[in-house]
C-alpha cells in the first residue's frame, strides 16, 4: 500500500511515519512525504500511489481529483477535520474513498482559545516585550477579571463543550448558540438565540464549522448587536468572520478586542515562513497593528496529543479502506482497495 503525503512538515513525518512504522497494518504502508502542497501542478507526484494524505490548504477541485484518479489514486485521507477544499460530488462520481479526522484533542483547541483570551485580556504579550526592554511600567496593561463575566460559545460540539468546561472554572456565566443543542452542554450553560448571545456576552468564542449557513456569521449586522467592548475569539475557521466588518468594529470601539488563530485569507500565508518576504495581505497586516488584536498561525490544535490522534486516525482510515471495512469517518465511501463500490456520499 503506497501513500503519498502532501504539504508534509517535519512533525507530520515524525508522527505519521513513526506510528506507521510501529503499527501492524495489513498490507504494509509505504509512505512518500512531499513538502509541496497538492495542486494541479503537483498532482502528478502521486503517480503510483494508492492513496494521498492531504491537509486543509491543499487544493482538491474537480481538475485535481481527475488528475489523481488518472495517476492511480483511489483514496484521499484528510489529516484534519475541515474538508471545505474538496469537491465531494466529483470525488463520489470518480469513486474515491474520502475520510477525515473529525475530532482530535478538542481540549487542545479549547485551551488555546482560553490562552488567547487571557493574552488579550491581561496583555501578557505586551508585558513580555516590555520587560525584555527593561520596562516594568504597568501603564496600558490593565485587564479585567474573568470571574463573573459572561462568555458566549457559538457551536457547542466537542470543542465548544471543552471550552465550556474550562471557562466554568473561571467562574464565568455561559451562554451558547447552536441549532443542535446537546444535553451535555446544558450542564454548564444556557442555550439562547444568536442575537441574545451577542448582546449579553463579554467574550464571544467561535467553535462552529464553516458551511453556507455560518459563512461570515460575524458580519456588519451581527457585530452591531454585540455588547460594546466585547472580545471576539476565533479558533475555528477563518471564513466565519467578515474581516472588514471586525476591522470597522475595532476602529469604532464596538469590539474591545480580537483574537484570531484562523483567518479567511490564510491559505497563502499560514504554515510557511514569510519573515523575509513582503506580505501583500494589507487587511491582515493592518489588523496586526492594533494593540487589542492577537493573531496566531492556526496552531490551536498543535499539541503532541493531537498530532498522535491525527496520525492514528488517518492511518486507521487507510487501513479500514484497504480491508474494505466501512468507517464512520468516511465523507465518501467510494470503492474499497479491491475496486468494489460501496455506498455513495456518506454526508455533506
UniProtKB/Swiss-Prot annotation:
Coiled coil: none annotated. Pfam families: 2-Hacid_dh, 2-Hacid_dh_C. The active site is at 237, 266, 298 (proton donor). Signal peptide: none annotated. Pathway: Secondary metabolite biosynthesis. One of its GO terms (biological process) is antibiotic biosynthetic process. Disruption phenotype: Abolishes completely the production of KK-1. Keywords: Antibiotic biosynthesis, NAD, Oxidoreductase. Induction: Expression is positively regulated by the KK-1 cluster-specific transcription factor kk1F. The keyword Oxidoreductase applies. NAD(+) binds at residues 158-159, 178, 208-209, 235-237, 261. GO terms for molecular function: D-lactate dehydrogenase activity; NAD binding. The keyword NAD applies. InterPro entries: D-isomer_2_OHA_DH_cat_dom, D-isomer_DH_CS, D-isomer_DH_CS1, D-isomer_DH_NAD-bd, NAD(P)-bd_dom_sf. It comes from the Eukaryota. D-lactate dehydrogenase; part of the gene cluster that mediates the biosynthesis of KK-1, a novel cyclic depsipeptide with 10 residues which is a promising active compound with high activity against many plant pathogens, especially Botrytis cinerea. Within the pathway, kk1H catalyzes in the synthesis of D-lactic acid from pyruvic acid, which is recognized by the A domain of the first kk1B module. Belongs to the D-isomer specific 2-hydroxyacid dehydrogenase family. This is D-lactate dehydrogenase kk1H. The lineage of its organism: Eukaryota, Fungi, Dikarya, Ascomycota, Pezizomycotina.
